[in-house]
Amino acid sequence: HRHRLLASCRILGIPAPTLTLPTGGPDRVVRAEVSAEGATISERSLGTVRPVSLVFSQVLHEPYRHKVIERTQFDRTLEAAREAGADDGLLLTKQGHVAEAAIWSLYWWEGATLCAPPLGLGILPAVSRARIGQLAGPLVERRVTRAELEGKSLIVSNAARGVVPVSFLEGKSVPEQPETARLQDAFWP
């Protein structure tokens, strides 16, 4: 995260901050917000991690390359998904390709091959995605439509929670994949 943060600061012309991270203990989410005025650090408890339920968002995915606090598309997606009884929503591009969820990177299994939406869709090059690429071998990047995800085993990831299986997509049960458990176990060194 630190490397991505510093690279984004360089590209966006923001002075690199000196970060002193809190020491709240294990299972904490630490958030650094950096602006031209300085940096703020916050932390919160991780909470329980369980399989997630996803729905498709009506909000279109707008490409971005840096993790910034302007997250309107993701906030609207997450709010609508939770109102619908799901944990998160999947955003589609204007061309109808699945991009990512509001707080998760998305992957699907095609046999023993792990696939992910291409970074070229303008999704964040997530730290968790890089870790999964180390563990699963190179991810196969594929453009996929919502219909093409039906019946596939799905997983999501983020740096706070690691690898998490998807239990339901649009209210339909998602099949499990044995390789998911191996990724979950190996994600945290």
Task: For every predicted segment, state its role.
Residues H1-H97, E110, G120-I123, R129-P189:
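Conserved alpha/beta cores of soluble small-molecule-handling proteins
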Residues S105-W109:
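Short conserved beta-strand segments at catalytic cores or DNA/RNA-binding microdomains
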Residues C115-L119:
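Short internal beta-strands
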Residues H97-W104:
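Short beta-strand/strand-turn micro-motif
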